[in-house]
Amino acid sequence: MLALRRHFRLVLMLAVVLAAATPAAVRAQGKLEARYSATLAGIQIGKGSWVIDITDTQYMAAANGVTTGLMRVFTGGEGTSAAHGTLQAGQPMSSIFASTIAASHKTDDVSLTVANGIVTESRLDPPLETEPDRVPISDENRKGILDPMTASLMRTPGSGNPLSPEACQRTVAIFDGRLRYDLQFAFKRMDKVKADKGYAGPVVVCAVYFSPIAGYISSRAAIRYVSKLRDIEVWLAPIAGTRVLVPFRMQGPTPIGKFVLEANQFVSVPIPTRASANGLKTQ
């Protein structure tokens, strides 16, 4: 059971890495309703849902998930996360982030307030424990960051097809309240997907490389393991009406098999801009 719990913590860390990406900037607005299934070595271990709303002035993203099957028997877990922010010059700027994860009879709560990329307030329950080999989080580490939920939206630069290699060319600074880390993305290939409900079409596949910066315990095996991985992938699909791409599928190796998080529902619809809506009303 202890071994399963250790592997579960590793899977949770891998899921955090896979779920993070970069900020989005939109020319139009859209909404996404998605449902995901998580498997480990081909066995379902979890499921979740994700809702994203992007308007002309702000965005909202919320997700929840639970463990299922054998994983729930040994280490039941569930979690929720949400973020809200404004669009400044088309760029999402984090305002509020909150996350709650409950697993193995323990609950972890995090809330962040962010202004202009700088963390102005953070609340952790339980507080971050003092460990001799924990890399301290400095004030500088709290600047120029994205919260993990805001970081899950990727905007392709330019005016061409957003499903292009350029979507992957970036490095992102992320702070989740306890850990400051970088994710580096690199283009791997184009592929195709088909959800049971919703999107069917091309995706951009990016390689993802995790680099811990601060807040981590250097002796932790999970940190060392994920830092060395070179086989993590994220498959990006579009939110209709925007240049924003978000993860459709995420995968990476673990010591006991491949971890995969994949959408079985990916329903995305464009929302008319205010100018478009006003034009329709006058016709």
Whereabouts are the PLM-identified features?
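Acidic, serine/threonine-rich low-complexity disordered tracts
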Residues: 26-116, 159-283
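Bacterial N-terminal signal peptides
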Residues: 11-21
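Bacterial N-terminal signal peptides that target proteins for export
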Residues: 1-13
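Long, charge-rich C-terminal accessory regions
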Residues: 152, 156-158
